[in-house]
């Protein structure tokens, strides 16, 4: 196949005339193309699953682990592709955000040591990617393991990281998890406290209800006290429905 120009490839995408032949896409790919076009081509390869994976491997061998190629590895959903990403993770000297994002849906296969290493990173992007990985495994962990893994992210000075961790904890209903959420409601910034209250309200146990009730008098900010009252009201309705 003759080398296609950027304009020809763009025109094909605009006309929805991209062949479903992975070899065609592989041959159309070039590092000289703008990132947007390379990403579209690799995305199409990823969507071709096992057929696309063969071409993705070939392109990585030729061009290395370009971000768009690693993205394609993640979305092709092949076991061999997953193993490739896990090997890359273990072999990396420095954590690669592209590898972590590509592994997202396979978070459950990472071991606790791998997750701990990722979540201890100082990088916001890497911590958030690590929490996304953890979200696929959190239901498999004892609450002590889970709390240990989210300990560093929950102490992060960036609200976005802490809130991501809170959203993982709110899927659990153990007393230790509820206690940690209560601490965040008391000691965190306004957005963190607000999210912690929402998490406590969504858990729906008698213990979480008691902690919310205590927070109503312990919180210093009136708006947060009102939000705690609202969560308590919602939870009381939920508990009444369960009991009846």
Predicted features by range, described:
Residues 241-244:
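Short acidic DE-rich linear segments
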Residues 146-147, 191, 220-221:
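HEAT/HEAT-like alpha-solenoid repeats
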Residues 24-26, 55-57, 84-86, 114-116, ...:
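Buried hydrophobic core positions in alpha-solenoid tandem helical repeats
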Residues 2-17, 26-27, 35-50, 58-61, ...:
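Structural detector for internal amphipathic alpha-helices that build alpha-solenoid repeat scaffolds
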């Amino acid at each position: 196949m003759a080398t296609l120009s950027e304009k020809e490839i763009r025109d094909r995408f605009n006309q929805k005339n991209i062949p479903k032949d992975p070899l065609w896409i592989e041959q159309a790919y070039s590092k000289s193309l703008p990132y947007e076009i390379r990403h579209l081509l690799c995305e199409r390869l990823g969507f071709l699953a096992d057929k696309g994976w063969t071409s993705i491997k070939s392109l990585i061998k030729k061009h290395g682990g370009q971000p768009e190629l690693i993205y394609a590895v993640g979305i092709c959903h092949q076991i061999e592709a997953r193993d490739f990403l896990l090997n890359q993770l273990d072999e990396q000297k420095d954590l690669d955000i592209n590898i972590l994002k590509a592994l997202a849906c396979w978070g459950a296969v990472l071991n606790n040591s791998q997750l701990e290493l990722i979540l201890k990173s100082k990088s916001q992007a890497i911590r958030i990617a690590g929490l996304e990985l953890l979200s696929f495994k959190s239901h498999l962990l004892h609450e002590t393991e889970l709390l240990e893994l989210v300990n560093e992210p929950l102490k992060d000075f960036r609200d976005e990281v802490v809130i991501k961790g809170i959203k993982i904890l709110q899927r659990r209903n153990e007393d230790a998890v509820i206690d940690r959420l209560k601490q965040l409601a008391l000691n965190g910034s306004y957005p963190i406290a607000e999210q912690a209250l929402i998490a406590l309200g969504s858990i729906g146990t008698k213990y979480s209800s008691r902690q919310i009730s205590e927070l109503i008098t312990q919180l210093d900010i009136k708006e947060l006290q009102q939000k705690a009252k609202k969560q308590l009201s919602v939870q009381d309705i939920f508990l009444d429905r369960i009991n009846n």
